[in-house]
Amino acid sequence: MNRQTVMENSMVPSTCARPIELYVFIDPLCEDCWSLQPLLRKLQLEYDRYFTLRIALRTSLPSMNLPCIQKNEDALACDKVHPTYPIIAVKAAEFQGKRAGLRFLSKVFEYSFLKSRNVSSFSVLVEIAEKLELDVDEFIRDFSSKNVLRSLQVDVYMAKEMEVDKAATFVFFNGNIEDEGLKVSGLYEYEVYEQILEELVGMTIIPDIPPPLEDLFQRFDVLATNEIADIYNISEKSAERELKKRLLQQYIERITFQDTTLWRKKQL
């Protein structure tokens, strides 16, 4: 498997602006993929100039063809539920822009693993689209469109070509399109991904200085205290102090789920 084969057959546009292409295969229902988010964000913040990130959804075509399940027989009250709905919904959100897709994916993780909501429910996915202020009518139309299914089929094809059989999986490609990709399945320490990136670039990579806290909340919707501490290489206590300053300034707001505290830009 090399990048030339994948790119020719998947019709995904390539770019030469950065030396590395990084494909990350994610399953919206996978807890490891949720845990991966802080690592991936930090990698983007520090080394974004070295790689182009492509998020692909890990799924399988047979499951896409299963009929939907209904919670009850009342057609007016029924809420359609199916395990493939979250994947379809992320793709539908992507049709409103790459960032919309990433924000939707993050919100699916939040609803599933923090709020314990059933993200396989169509009505819950529509609620997420509303929360993110997407065009909900467009989202619903795209959800059942052939274009979304074609986009998912591209991800399925890429996973097959890259021999990806689980999420989360990273696949790194260097500047030579004939070289094999380097596949890393599962979760590892941040330094492992740094080392791989450096080896593929072929020189010492220098991390970018993290942006001001306000800019961070412009880029990412929701962040945890420990994630912010890690990004700025400070203690959690120091991070919380800075966050509370912004809280008093009414720039951000705190949201708590059981024993987890998250922060986001204040909703108007």
Predicted regions: what they are:
Residues 2-20:
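A short beta-strand-turn-helix
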Residues 25, 119-268:
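C-terminal cap of thioredoxin/glutaredoxin-like
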